[in-house]
């Protein structure tokens, strides 16, 4: 179920403070975050945010087509490598 419009999008406070501070100074550094549930809002455009995938932080450049999506949608947490070629049990 989507979030109520009267509440507005969820963005972690620490992430919002860092982005507003960098926008005020005009800087562009990689921002590290564990907040995969934060929604991408227009002030994030042009920043690179390193999002945690459970093991490491992967840098993602934010563009205008990502607005409204969650940060966690762009970093996969599972690494599927496919089934083994010589595995006879999987073929049955």
UniProtKB/Swiss-Prot annotation:
- Signal peptide region: none
Predominantly, its location class is: plastid
Regions annotated as coiled coil: none
Location of the protein in the cell: Plastid, Chloroplast
> Is the RNA-binding keyword given for this protein?
yes
The superkingdom listed in its UniProt entry is Eukaryota
Sorted alphabetically, which keywords does the UniProt record give? Answer: Chloroplast, Plastid, Ribonucleoprotein, Ribosomal protein, RNA-binding, rRNA-binding
| GO CC term (a single one) | chloroplast
Give any GO molecular function from the UniProt entry.
rRNA binding
> Matching InterPro entries, A to Z?
Ribosomal_uS19, Ribosomal_uS19_bac-type, Ribosomal_uS19_CS, Ribosomal_uS19_SF
Which GO BP terms apply? ribosomal small subunit assembly; translation
Q: Report the family membership.
A: Belongs to the universal ribosomal protein uS19 family.
> Any idea what job this protein has?
Protein S19 forms a complex with S13 that binds strongly to the 16S ribosomal RNA.
Q: Sorted alphabetically, which HAMAP family does this protein's record hold?
A: Ribosomal_uS19 (MF_00531)
Protein name as it appears in the record: Small ribosomal subunit protein uS19c
């Amino acid at each position: 179920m989507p979030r109520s419009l009267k509440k507005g999008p969820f963005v972690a406070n620490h992430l919002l403070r860092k982005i507003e501070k960098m926008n005020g100074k005009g800087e562009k550094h990689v921002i590290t975050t564990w907040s995969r549930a934060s929604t991408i809002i227009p002030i994030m455009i042009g920043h690179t945010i390193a999002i945690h995938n459970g093991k490491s932080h992967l840098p993602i450049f934010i563009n205008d087509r990502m607005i409204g999506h969650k940060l966690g949608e762009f970093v996969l947490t599972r690494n599927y490598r496919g089934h083994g070629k010589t595995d006879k049990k999987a073929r049955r």
